[in-house]
Amino acid sequence: MADDGLLLNFSLGDSNVIKAEPKLKGGTWRDRLSARKIAQHRSKGPRKPGDENTAPRVPRNPNQIEVSATRPQKRQRTDGGDGGRPQSHAQSNQPRQFISSLFTKNPEPKNVEEVKEEGPVEEAKPTNAPLIDGLDTFTNLGLSPSLAAHLLTKLELKAPTAIQKASISQLLKEDGDAFIQAETGSGKTLAYLLPLVQRIMTLSKPTTDATGQPIVHRDSGLFAIVLAPTRELCKQISVVLESLLRCAHWIVAGTVIGGEKKKSEKARLRKGLNILVATPGRLADHLENTKVLDVSNVRWLVLDEGDRLMELGFEEEIQGIVKKLDARQRPSRIPGIPTKRTTVLCSATMKMNVQKLGEISLKDAVHIKADPEDEDEKARLANKEEDSAYRVPAQLKQSYAVVAAKLRLVTLTAYLKRTFMRKGSVMKTIVFVSCADSVDFHFEVFTRKKQQTDDADASDEEKTEEKPLSPHGTIAPATAFSNPSNPVTLYRLHGSLPQNVRTSTLASFAKNREPSVLICTDVASRGLDLPNVDLVVEYDPAFSAEDHLHRIGRTARVGRDGRALVFLMPGCEENYVEILKRGYRDGGKALTRVDANDILKRGFGGNVEAGKKDWDVKATDWQCEVERWSLENPQYLEMARRAFQSHIRAYATHIAAERSMFNIKELHLGHLAKAFALRDRPSKINVPGLRQGKEETKKDFKAERRPAAGQKRKADGADMGDSKSSSSHDTATSAQKMRAKMKEHMAGASEFNLA
């Protein structure tokens, strides 16, 4: 086709001009990616004002707020704000706080059982009460008339319990070893102390012709040693022993326990003792280093709470004590003293470790039980697959409540408010938690001063009356669940407190005749006979079934009535109910379930039948008030974080047989943090010893690898700018470590389960 001379000119415009993309070379791939994005952004060019009219119109959403394309002019604030001051962006680096609702997204209980209404219940016959038969008196068991009269007149004990009847007659009749097994609260302490005192009183009956004084006195030597696992139990045994020895003043008893000065203990040993109550560790120390401690005349050795002795790791100490007693035993010149030593082992359970302790200390021991004639019971226990069998007192009314993690704190508060609503209904309550840090946190929450409605109107005198944060303040008014007609005193107790503070706190709680609550760890769960304890609350379930038995054994003692409540969370913890049922002779028919919402309604809403709907609002307001109180006080916020951390670490220490019921992987840490008045994400709760979240660990690792802006990197990978401040950084780090170490020694709440 021939060229006709026509020339075509097409106008494409500036927007459709094809531009060559530059090829980027060199640098890292991050730098090339950033440069490519910048080039693409520049190639688009500025947006023309008329382009918005040519864009397709999107149908309007009635719920969408239209925003103008042109930015309106700012107006000056007239509400007393900062005006034109530029806003600081420092808050963007702070951890975001999320205030979740108490009653949303809570897991539902898996096992839905019918909640039994409270009504007239058939009274169960007490299984640990003194015998009613008039023939079973202390005199008929072989005790001297003076000791029996002392029990009747001074101690007001008219008849022995079943275990006391069986053990006193056996230990007075024979000199062989014995294993005493009885349920908690049945009087095991007197079961071995009465034969011990009676045998030593029998040795002192012959008198010399010259002076007329008993042959046995404090210089005659040490005849008996009683070992107990905890200092509190040693103190209690010593108090009971001193009350018995008031009828035999020439017999002297003493204690050697940890936490006291060894110099004072050596002075007591130098003066002379006939009966010694001790902890295994301190006794082993004295046997090794104290020459004045003469054990050649020791003829009675008692191991109280044998299962706890083994759990606390005293096996080596006890084995060494037994070997030293055997090696140092010598024939005595005192007439009537046994030729060989008698060892008595006491325990409420028959576990494998108790049997191992018996192999170490006992030889041909007699098994003493409260009901040896019950052959059906013995046969049934022999066919059980478990290595231990524990029994709950029949008169103890036990219940459990399935409470969501977020509702734990408010539910406990509501239950205590309802318990102490009327004066005289409940005198004393013990609340068991898993760790010492949790004890300190809940003590501060329940004893905090209520916030003023108007801080400006509060006088200076009212501000000075606020309770200071004291590391050893263990007694305070319980403002969270007290009322004007029934004030309640709150106590706290755990193993990290100094020994003198623990002793004084426990004595004050025992002597207090007004309504009081003791919040504690398992340090108060073994052997302590605290009078008038009507209720036991297991806020955190025990680490084993045996520990649960000893916890609830603080109530319903020696025939008295008692109640116990266990808090469980929805999910795998509900299977723990089967463990609770095993402790009953009737298969758990007496075990009842309490609805968590009913507890909240009764605690925060008053009468349930009134149909009030504001109980959930009151519970939410109380929870938010505690959270604000925690945020406004850095020392309490740090305490809450430590309690949260220690609780999680303690949660993982359940025994292997029950670990499937307390699976730490199924814990909702965010919901659990709500129970400690925390609004932070669990990964943001940075306290010493708590592992950071995965994202924060990656960020810190990358930040350490990258040099700061304007700094050069050395050949060894360190930043040049770091060398200038290395000395100051090391000084600050060492000072911080020193403060943390001092705080650990002063506060003493670093452990999560001390007994």
UniProtKB/Swiss-Prot annotation:
Motif DEAD box at which residues? 304-307
- According to the record, the residues making up region (Disordered) are 28-128, 452-481, 685-755
Spell out the CDD domains in the cross-references: DEADc_DDX31 (cd17949), SF2_C_DEAD (cd18787)
Helicase ATP-binding domain: from which residue to which, for each copy?
A: 169-368
One annotated GO molecular function is: RNA helicase activity
Report the residue ranges that make up the Helicase C-terminal domain in this protein.
395-600
Signal peptide span per the entry?
none
The EC category is hydrolase
Which residue stretches does the UniProt record annotate as biased composition, category Basic and acidic residues? 107-125, 692-717
The record's annotation in InterPro entries points to: DEAD/DEAH_box_helicase_dom, Helicase_ATP-bd, Helicase_C-like, P-loop_NTPase, SPB4-like_CTE
- Can you state which reaction this protein catalyses? ATP + H2O = ADP + phosphate + H(+)
Q: Which residues bind ATP?
A: 182-189
User: Which keywords does UniProt give here?
Assistant: ATP-binding, Helicase, Hydrolase, Nucleotide-binding, Nucleus, Ribosome biogenesis, RNA-binding, rRNA processing
One cellular-component annotation, GO:
nucleolus
Q motif (motif): residue ranges: 136-165
Which residue stretches does the UniProt record annotate as biased composition, category Polar residues?
Answer: 61-71, 88-104
EC number in record = 3.6.4.13
The listed locations are: Nucleus, Nucleolus
Return the Acidic residues bias intervals: 454-463
Indicate, by first and last residue, each region the UniProt record lists as having compositional bias (Low complexity). 718-735
Q: Where is the composition biased (Basic residues)?
A: 38-47
Q: What else is known?
A: Present with 1460 molecules/cell in log phase SD medium.
Question: Which family, according to UniProt?
Answer: Belongs to the DEAD box helicase family. DDX31/DBP7 subfamily.
Q: What does this protein do?
A: ATP-binding RNA helicase involved in the biogenesis of 60S ribosomal subunits and is required for the normal formation of 25S and 5.8S rRNAs.
Name under which the protein is recorded: ATP-dependent RNA helicase dbp7
Q: What organism is this sequence from? A: Aspergillus clavatus (strain ATCC 1007 / CBS 513.65 / DSM 816 / NCTC 3887 / NRRL 1 / QM 1276 / 107)
